[in-house]
Every structure is written in C-alpha cells, then in structure tokens.
Amino acid sequence: MQEGKNIWSLILAAIRKELSEEEFYIWFENLYFIDAIGENIKIATPNSFHKNQVEKRFSKRIKEILIEKGHSTINVEFIHSQNELKDHNTESKDISLKAITHQQDLQTKNKDIKTHAKNIINNTKQYSIKEEIHIKYRNPFLKKKYTFENFIIGTNNKLAYNASLSIAKNPGKKYNPCLIYGGVGLGKTHLLQSIGNKTEELHKEFKILYVTAENFLNEFVESIKTNETKRFKKKYRHLDMLLLDDIHDLQKKEGIQEELFHTFNALYEDNKQMVFTCDRQPSELVNFTDRLKSRFTRGLNVDISKPNFELRVAIIEKKAEEDGIKVPKNILNLVAKKVTTNIRDLEAAVTKLKAHIDLEDIEIDTNIVDKIIKEIIAYENDNTNTPNKINIENIKKVILRELKLTNKDIEGNSKKPEITKARHIYAYLLRNFTELSTIEIGKIIGGKTHSTVLYSINKIDKDRNKNLEINNLIIELMNKINKN
C-alpha cells in the first residue's frame, strides 16, 4: 500500500513540472489514492468526465514516467463509478470517508475550495456518480502575486486602476461590463487578476473565474468533442464574476463568439460582474460579431497607455528592489529613457541586469545597459511582424538549418536533449511570430498536445531570463527568420 502511494507521489511530482499551475490543479488536485493491489494502483476521480479526460490526456505520459522511474510493470487505473469501486473490494462507506479526508486535505492546502463540496460528501452515505466534488472555479487561475497594493499607478493607468478597485468592492453595481484595453505588457492582466483577488477577499461566497480567451476557446472545443457542452454552459453561466483575458484572441472564431454572447446575456441578466481585457477598442476588433461588440460597450471601456518617464523609473526601482539589486541612478534613468514600450520590457531589462551581475559577477555600466536595451528592442521589433509577413515555413527552415536538424527530428518523439530543446524553441518561435493557438502549434510539431506546447513556450520564456546563451540563440534565430 505504502509503496503504491510513493509511486503515485513520484508520478504527480513529475507531471507537476510539465504542466502549468492551473492545468495541474484542474486535472490532478482532486484525484486521490485508493489502493494498491499487486502491481495495480487504483486512483479515484470525482466524476466520469474527469476520469475519461485524465485517461485520454495523461495515460501515455504516466506510463512513460513509470518506465523512467524503474516501475515499468506498474499499472495505474482510474476509477469512478460505484460498480468499479465495489469491484475493487472497497466498501462504499470507506470510499466516502476517504473522499471526505481528501477533501479536507484540499481545504488545508487551499482555503478557497468550496465548503459546499464537504457538505455534499458529509450528507451522503455513498459516493456515487451523481455526487461529484465541486471545487470553486476561481482558485486555480488567480495568482496571489497580482494585487492592487503592488500595482504602480500613473497618469496612464489611474482611471483603469480606480475602476477596477471599485468593481472589486461593489461587483455587479456600477461598471458592468467593464473592458480594459491597451497594448501588450501594460498591466491589463495585473488589474484583472487584482479584481479577482480583492473580490475573493471581500466576498468570500462569490464564484469567481479568471480565464484567458485561449483557454476559454480550448475548453469549449473540448466540450464539443466529448459531448459535455451542457457542463461547459453551466460552469460559465452560474458565476458571480467572470474575468476574461485577451478577448482579441477570439477574432475570426464564430462558434466561440456565439457561446460568449449567450454567456454574456445570462450573466448580465443576473447582474453578475464581467470584466474583459483586449489589446484594442471593441470597435477595432476584426471578424467579431457586431452584437457582441455592442455588449462590450454597454458598460465602461477604459484604456491603459504606455507609461511615461516618471512611471517607468518607478517600475524599474520597484523591480530592482524585488530582485535585490542596487541600480545606480544614472543607469536607472538610462533604462527608463531607452525602454519606452511597456512594463514587461522594463522588468525584463532589470531581470537581465540581475543575470549579468549574478552570472558574470560584474558591476553594471552603460555598455551592459546598451547591450540589454538592444536585445529588448530587437525582440520587440521581431514581434511586430504579423502572420502574413512571417511564413510558418520560413520559421521551420531557419530552425532546421541553424540547429542542423531534419523534419523527422523536429516533428518526431525523440527524447535526445538537443532535439527536445529544438522543439521547445520551435514552439516558442511559432507562438511569438504567429497568431496560432497552442493546439494549432501542436499539430505542426508532430501532433503535440496543448499542455506540451504550453510547457515548451513557458520553458523557453523562463530560460531566456536566466540563461544568456539561450537568450542570444533566440535573438539570433529571430533575426534570421526576419531576413529569410
């Protein structure tokens, strides 16, 4: 029994490293170990849909992990229905108690799990297919690091900040819906997440869900494939607050726009708060239904513009303080003067300064700053290209030529470190040079899953900030793609 638990813990630890926080929470946080008989490990799932999805998405990877860890003969079985539980000689009473214990463990780890879940289990004598554990929607997606307290206010974002704070204090009252629009890296997501976190603090009974437009789309498509559209509609139309990030990603996608239209109406009629973010005004959205655009303009539309010099200085100072580095005033002003794009680039500049200090053990001077600024400006210029300007085949040609690989390498399943690294880079470049979704990118790279592509993109993004060699390689590849 104990060995089985240990093996399951190894599997969870390995998968956690490969998935985003929200994906791991969605698929693995509410699974629990039941028993281990011989070489079979039994894992209980909260409902049949969850069981089917975990098997479909992760069975192959779990088997690979078992082989890697030296447990090739072990089999992991996911169970749900009462009949299955009885087949495994597990009394329904025991399962109910284990479910309660598991639920209490989850509540200890995460205070925001719906207390309703515990009531459901405590008030039932058996764990059956109809008695699902309902976990509060909001929690996996809200990141506690985003708060109103650490949002730096300036003339470019003060109105958006004040509106967001007002919404969190009085959701569904004044500004419903609210749409915050502006360029990349200006703080839209920070404000959106801050609304969720503050509302959660002030209105503990609220069902709050933050979701990106891409994940909203992916979940909708998946619900169609699995005939679970009713579950999807119920999830999104019974919220107290919907926070939908990057709605511009839904352009040219009529099906999901139709679903969002009906979700909007359902929430609006019930006076439930909705906040959206976009990289442009609703009127500028392309291939977006007029009736949906008109819904966005019913409430408050507020923009965030690029930070002015004073705000840029404040942002750099705060980031430097968080990273534990001292930036001389002349260097600080130089970065603020040269990097005028957005907050993300300002913070990236400080991160790169820290990398130079930590990895090369040198003092910051204007030469280093100039080099870093050139890298950031080159990266921004690279990302101004549209999918029409950058051909997907050009990206592939550069990757194959510069990294000395073949089509089979880049689209196959080789585990060789250099090939795996190349696939990560390929996914990252496709994401940055095109408007392809992670699902579409996965198809290009040999049928990889959404979670695999997301892992690749996030890995390269993190590596660029802490590994100068990787960062220089990416910049070099980007330059060659532009020239190709």
From Swiss-Prot:
Domain IV, binds dsDNA: annotated segments:
358-484
Entries under InterPro entries matching the protein: AAA+_ATPase, Chromosome_initiator_DnaA, Chromosome_initiator_DnaA-like, Chromosome_initiator_DnaA_CS, DnaA_C, DnaA_dom, DnaA_N_dom, DnaA_N_sf
Q: What superkingdom heads the lineage?
A: Bacteria
Renumbered residue ranges of the record's region Domain I, interacts with DnaA modulators: 1-73
Annotated GO CC locations? cytoplasm; plasma membrane
Q: How does it assemble?
A: Oligomerizes as a right-handed, spiral filament on DNA at oriC.
Summary of the function given for this chain in its UniProt record: Plays an essential role in the initiation and regulation of chromosomal replication. ATP-DnaA binds to the origin of replication (oriC) to initiate formation of the DNA replication initiation complex once per cell cycle. Binds the DnaA box (a 9 base pair repeat at the origin) and separates the double-stranded (ds)DNA. Forms a right-handed helical filament on oriC DNA; dsDNA binds to the exterior of the filament while single-stranded (ss)DNA is stabiized in the filament's interior.
The UniProt entry's sequence similarity note says: Belongs to the DnaA family.
Q: What is this protein called?
A: Chromosomal replication initiator protein DnaA
